[in-house]
């Protein structure tokens, strides 16, 4: 296994927290630490009239978040490589700190081409 990839949908979150760039920077940093990952860089951007996007570059891969405070919604992506990291822990931090009332988490194992070849019989072609 190369790593784990978590896609997290957060619903009915605290709108003020979703729109607070400094709060999100702190929360993403905490999430990376809780996952056992090494934070290399963190960039965030606030949008007008609302919303924040953040991207944490990890030694093990990345964490990204996009927020829509007006809808109480955040889209989160956590991808970590290696066996020592726990991306689900990062997701739990973000869920709790953003006070999500509901969430949906999808977790995928990322595999090398050799490992995928053992499990995929017919490759799926993307359009275009």
Swiss-Prot record:
The pathway this protein participates in, as annotated, is:
Amine and polyamine biosynthesis; S-adenosylmethioninamine biosynthesis; S-adenosylmethioninamine from S-adenosyl-L-methionine: step 1/1
Q: Which reaction does it catalyse?
A: S-adenosyl-L-methionine + H(+) = S-adenosyl 3-(methylsulfanyl)propylamine + CO2
Site label Cleavage (non-hydrolytic), positions: 60-61
Q: Which Pfam families match?
A: AdoMet_dc (PF02675)
What does the entry comment about cofactor binding?
Answer: Binds 1 pyruvoyl group covalently per subunit.
Sites of the modification Pyruvic acid (Ser)?
61
**What is the role of this chain?**
Catalyzes the decarboxylation of S-adenosylmethionine to S-adenosylmethioninamine (dcAdoMet), the propylamine donor required for the synthesis of the polyamines spermine and spermidine from the diamine putrescine.
Give the family, as the similarity comment puts it: Belongs to the prokaryotic AdoMetDC family. Type 1 subfamily.
Question: Could you describe the subunit structure of this protein?
Answer: Heterotetramer of two alpha and two beta chains arranged as a dimer of alpha/beta heterodimers.
Question: What's the protein name?
Answer: S-adenosylmethionine decarboxylase proenzyme
